[in-house]
């Protein structure tokens, strides 16, 4: 399926708090930039990279002791919590499509 043919019905799970750090290396970029919070976002897919309307986000705090590896694990845990919640809300029509 092509994104341009999806009529706004495709969601994406992204490993940053969009609009910050779009693209494939969101966790690494947040870590290298030195921000104190990051997280994950679920958004509607549009032709523009990671620019669709945001459905929901989950915050992850970056501790002084975090390594890139530990931060990656924390963001993945947040993603695994957020995605089923959003899918459930979509299935119950609690979230409208764009």
Annotate each predicted stretch with a short phrase.
Residues 4-98:
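Donor/substrate-binding cores of folate-linked one-carbon enzymes
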């Amino acid at each position: 399926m092509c994104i341009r043919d999806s009529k706004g019905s495709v969601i994406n799970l992204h490993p940053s708090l969009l609009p910050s750090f779009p693209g494939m290396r969101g966790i690494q970029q947040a870590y290298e930039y030195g921000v104190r919070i990051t997280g994950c976002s679920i958004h509607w897919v549009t032709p523009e990279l990671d620019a669709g309307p945001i459905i929901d986000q989950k915050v992850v705090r970056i501790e002084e002791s975090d390594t890139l590896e530990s931060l990656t694990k924390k963001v993945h845990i947040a993603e695994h919590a957020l995605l089923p919640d959003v899918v459930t809300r979509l299935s119950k029509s609690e979230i409208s499509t764009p």
